[in-house]
Design a protein with these regions (language model features):
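Non-catalytic recognition/regulatory regions in large multidomain proteins
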Residues: 1-107, 112-139, 143-144, 161-163, ...
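Short beta-strand "wing" residues that participate in macromolecule-binding interfaces
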Residues: 147-148
């Protein structure tokens, strides 16, 4: 359980041993105390997932969000996902994942680029739409924010995608309308 939390973005029920979630159910508080004492972090345990959220001074391997242009884009994409859930357009399952058609997910990415692309770094701003969609999806999959299933043409959005969101400051948004 420790290794899964330390070396991945999150743990999800159904991916790995069910005993891991039973362990969290009974020993989660003690595990949280151990991790919080040894690292600057917090353990977030939910019904179908658990996350090891690092503090600003904690540097254990690669972290998300990084100080990169793609991290900014992914944070804004996570905000778009949250908007769709809050509006009722996308509905979470019992395990807090969201299953959406691949075309709907890709349309959301295109909409994000159209609305916010002026603020992206040059490489992403000038990138063709199809390449932008592929790169954003690949990066989201790398950080286990989503899982694409080409066979069923669906995207599973993991709960971690709703934990962090980003947007441009209001003064920037108003200036670029």
């Amino acid at each position: 359980v420790y290794k899964r939390l330390l070396f991945s973005v999150g743990m999800y029920r159904g991916e790995g041993a069910e005993e891991d979630f039973e362990y969290l159910k009974y020993y989660g508080r003690r595990l949280a105390d151990d991790l919080e004492q040894n690292f600057q972090c917090q353990l977030h345990i939910h019904r179908g997932s658990a996350f090891f959220m690092q503090g600003e001074d904690c540097r254990i391997g690669d972290t998300f969000p990084e100080n990169t242009g793609i991290s900014d884009i992914l944070l804004m994409c996570c905000a778009k996902i949250r908007e769709r859930v809050e509006s009722g357009a996308w509905t979470p399952e019992k395990d807090d994942t969201i299953e959406v058609p691949l075309l709907d997910f890709e349309e959301m990415l295109r909409q994000l680029k159209a609305e916010s692309g002026a603020g992206f770094i040059k490489g992403y701003r000038e990138m063709p739409e199809g390449e932008f969609v592929r790169e954003a999806e690949a990066e989201m999959e790398k950080w286990t924010l989503i899982r694409r299933d080409r066979r069923t043409q669906t995207v599973t959005v993991y709960p971690s995608a709703a934990k962090l969101t980003g947007r441009y400051p209001d003064d920037y948004t108003e200036k670029n309308k």
